[in-house]
Amino acid sequence: MAKEFSRTQRIGDQMQRELALLIQREIKDPRLGLITITAVDVSRDLSHAKIFITIMGQDDDQEAIKGNLRILNDAAGFLRMQLGKSMKLRTVPQLHFNYDASIRRGVELSSLIERAVAEDRKHSDERGE
């Protein structure tokens, strides 16, 4: 049995693919880092879309993150126009770019777990178990 996806989810997936290409090919700002779109959440009425991004190599630099978000939000009108040309939608959602910290947080939690396991092994070896 096939999985059922809502229309907004299908539109979000298509927007994610289209925006990735547009950002890579059309935005020529040298200040823009290597952007990865992790998710696109589209409202039910298709009026707004939240685009979640990560920036490779600049995850710890808050100023770089803010600068990249500013560049993308300033280019949102242009990107929306280009999406309108490539997607068959009556109305194209307004684009809102947000930083996705979940990947960075996942890496931090993974390192904490690895450290805890290493300390546990060290203590069990000292006790002779």
UniProtKB/Swiss-Prot annotation:
Main location per the UniProt record: cytoplasm
Keywords: Cytoplasm, Ribosome biogenesis
Cellular component aspect of the GO annotation: cytosol
The keyword Cytoplasm appears for this protein: yes
A Pfam family hit: RBFA
Similarity comment: Belongs to the RbfA family.
The name this protein goes by in its record: Ribosome-binding factor A
Gene this chain is encoded by: rbfA
